[in-house]
UniProtKB/Swiss-Prot annotation:
Cellular localization per UniProt: Cytoplasm; Nucleus
Keyword Transcription in annotation: no
Predominant localisation class: cytoplasm
The name this protein goes by in its record: Pre-mRNA-splicing factor PRP46
Gene: PRP46
Its job: Involved in pre-mRNA splicing and required for cell cycle progression at G2/M.
Sections of the chain in a coiled coil: none
Positions of region (Disordered): 1-21, 103-126
């Protein structure tokens, strides 16, 4: 339907206006006002807050006040503690403080507006673009580029204070040389009571010596190849031995006879260790496996596999990791005895790991190989690396630690080093002098152990002798 405007005379005044199909006028006005606010609201600050957003803010504030009304203020005791004497404040950097107090017109980061301003004022000197303006360039250049601050000096003093000084350790001297073996002395074990010690050598004989006099007390024969490991039980009168003939034997020291054999290794057995609190024996050998034995039933409880080369040394302790093994594949593995699985593999060594030593009281151990930085200290139970023992450039065959934090390392070339275990610094170097007696006598240290008091050190070497070193009072 269409309508037309007519004049009083009845004639039409113009074209007809179609009223149908047009949107309501109120909707058009509302849409136009919204566009106007969006375009001009930023300059005129006339944009009104949306009612729904304001209502949500009020609702959230009310819920927070209701939810946390009981914990908004601290109890009087805690308030008194927080308002106590304040500690030393962290020193502030002058450059940051100066830039913060320069005023609101100072901009730390330059933008397009800053570039326009600099181009419009040619008299202005161009400054370096940096996050924080450095206001001591003259002094920095005058000191030759070595700007010192209170913060750096404080850090240096703190670092110097952290350095641990080594303990004083008396000197060690050779006090006795014992001969009697007809081959290289490859294994030594100390009696828990420090009355006697046992040695094994390439002559396939185990000899038991009196520690005080150095006299031979007993010789045990039974192995048919070089003896590589010895261990004395702390809780039983048993002596355990392993050799390159794949045999692991248990000797009864009351009858001086073999009472048990442990069969399972496919090649020579190079090391063994007795658990201090369990009736468990651990061995490692050339078949790259670590085997866990029941001491009484001779059962092979676990065969721990993972090494890819000869296992050079194994150690046990009564806390995790209860078994530690070092191998010719340049790795040290920490084993979980309860699960029979590897807990961690340490790959810091570059060459074969030949020796391990566990600290008697501190929760740590050391490992040794050949080459530079060849002795490393680790923290149990994760095997966290602590530090290197630098200075013994040789193939390390044996390590021993006593309760007075003295670490001994013996090498293939006959050099001996005594270290302060806490700092990793050497305090004495010795040289193994080969004793005359045969044409093939040469310098070289293969095994070592401290007695229970930590004042005597026993070593076995390539000159077929046993040497006893004593701490000088």
């Amino acid at each position: 339907m269409s309508t037309s405007l007519e004049t009083p005379s009845g004639t039409s005044a113009g074209p007809s206006i179609v009223a149908s199909g047009l949107p309501p006028l109120a909707d058009l006005v509302r849409a136009g006002s919204k566009r106007t606010r969006v375009v001009y609201g930023a300059e005129t600050s006339a944009v009104e807050d949306d009612g729904l957003a304001r209502a949500n803010k009020i609702k959230l504030a009310t819920k927070l006040a209701i939810e946390y009304k009981d914990v908004q203020t601290l109890p009087p005791i805690l308030q008194a503690q927080q308002t106590g004497p304040a500690g030393p404040k962290r020193p502030t950097q002058p450059s940051i403080a100066a830039s913060a107090t320069a005023g609101p017109n100072v901009k730390l980061i330059g933008g397009p507006e800053a570039e326009k301003a600099s181009s419009s004022t040619p008299q202005a000197v161009a400054e370096p673009r940096s996050l924080v303006k450095f206001r001591h360039q003259e002094g920095f250049a005058a000191e030759g580029g070595q700007a010192t601050s209170r913060l750096s000096q404080a850090l240096m003093r703190k670092k110097e204070a952290r350095e641990v000084k080594p303990e004083y350790h008396p000197e060690w001297k050779l006090t006795r040389v014992i001969s009697g073996h007809m081959g290289w002395v490859r294994a030594v074990a100390m009696d828990p009571g420090s009355q006697w010690f046992a040695t094994g050598a390439g002559d396939r004989v185990i000899k038991i010596w009196d520690l005080a006099s150095g006299e031979l007390k007993l010789s045990l024969t039974g192995h048919i190849s070089t003896i590589r490991g010895l261990a004395v039980s702390d809780r039983h009168p048993y002596l355990f031995s392993c050799a390159e003939d794949k045999m692991v034997k248990c000797w009864d020291l009351e009858t001086n006879k073999v009472i048990r054999h442990y069969h399972g290794h496919f090649s020579g057995v190079y090391s063994l260790s007795v658990h201090p609190t369990l009736d468990v024996l651990v061995t490692g050998g050339r078949d790259a496996s670590v085997r866990v034995w029941d001491m009484r039933t001779r059962a092979n409880i676990f065969t721990l596999t993972g090494h890819t080369s000869t296992v050079g040394d194994v150690k046990t302790q009564d806390s995790d990791p209860q078994i530690i093994s070092g191998s010719m594949d340049s790795t040290v593995r920490l084993w979980d005895l309860a699960a029979g699985k590897c807990m961690n593999t340490l790959t810091h060594h570059k060459k074969s790991v030949r020796a391990l030593a566990i600290h008697p009281t501190e929760y740590s151990f050391a490992s040794a190989s050949s080459g530079g930085n060849n002795i490393k200290k680790w923290k149990c139970p994760e095997g966290i690396f602590v530090n290197n023992f630098v200075g013994h450039e040789a193939i390390i065959n044996t390590l021993s630690i006593n309760s007075e934090n003295v670490l001994f390392s013996g090498a293939d070339n006959g050099t001996l080093t005594l270290w302060d275990y806490k700092t990793g610094l050497p305090f004495q170097h010795l040289k193994d002098i080969p004793q005359p007696g045969s044409l093939d006598a040469e310098a070289g240290v293969f095994c070592s152990t401290f007695d229970k008091t930590g004042t005597r050190l026993i070593t076995g070497g390539a000159d077929k002798t046993i040497k006893v070193y004593s701490e000088q009072a």
